[in-house]
Design a protein with these regions (language model features):
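N-terminal segments that mediate ammonia production and transfer
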Residues: 1-229
Length: 229
């Protein structure tokens, strides 16, 4: 199962300020089958990077992304439920073709099969994993970002299953919906950066011992609620 987080600050920061945290999240979350990031650029647009290897081993990618300055970023560390889906087309985050948002997910969506034929027949599927189905659904249902928490709740109601859902919008807002009973979502501060992250499949707060011991303002996001940062 994947790990993911959204992070935001009032003032721009270099993304590699989050790399020590990301390294520990991948190692302790056992997520080493691809990684990706989407960030808000100085041009006001979303920019993305993806690689099918591990974050730890991708020195070139870490350097490229880490050198970027942003106010908001979404990072996804992949451990797919089906290893047969490893590949570029299923590496997250998924970018909205219109540039309105970027989306990632962890867990398993129970009813993704209900939507697969619809999107496949429309020529909108490029991979095989369940996340792409929910990304396409979100593209169709997007209401301009007026109420992202409600939209993520509706997405989870439509697909069901254990799933955490993360979104970064073009205006730099980050959202993390908690819907996975096996992997809680926490919010906390790493210095001046606010973070909403999955919790390494530990139902207690061991996340803060092994991944983010320096975190302050720690809170658990209740199931079926969305953290907005």
């Amino acid at each position: 199962m994947c790990e993911q987080y959204v992070a935001r600050a009032d003032e721009p920061f270099r993304i590699d300020e989050l790399w020590p945290f990301t390294d520990k999240l991948e190692r302790n979350g056992i997520a080493s089958y691809g990684w990706g990031a989407t960030w808000l650029g100085a041009d006001g647009e979303l920019h993305s990077y993806r690689d099918t290897g591990t974050f730890v081993d991708d020195a070139k990618g870490r350097s490229k992304v880490g050198a970027q300055t942003t106010r908001a970023v979404l990072v996804h560390l992949r451990r797919p439920s089906k290893l047969s889906t490893i590949g570029p087309a299923d590496t997250q985050p998924f970018d909205d073709p219109a540039g309105r948002f970027s989306f990632s997910h962890n867990g398993a969506l129970r009813h993704e099969g209900r939507f697969r034929k619809r999107f496949r027949d429309a020529g909108r599927l490029h991979g095989r994993a369940d996340t792409e189905m929910s990304a396409r659904w979100l593209e169709d249902e997007w209401d301009g970002g007026a109420n992202v928490p409600a939209m993520l709740r509706h997405l989870h109601e439509a697909f069901e299953g254990d799933a955490n859902l993360a979104v970064l919008t073009r205006d730099g807002a980050g959202y993390h919906y908690a819907g996975n009973s096996e992997n809680p979502v926490f919010t906390f501060d790493l210095g001046r950066i606010r973070v909403a992250s999955t919790g390494i499949h530990s139902l207690d707060r061991s996340f803060f011992r092994y991944v983010a011991p320096e975190a302050t303002n720690r809170k658990l996001v209740p199931r079926s609620r969305t953290a907005s940062i």
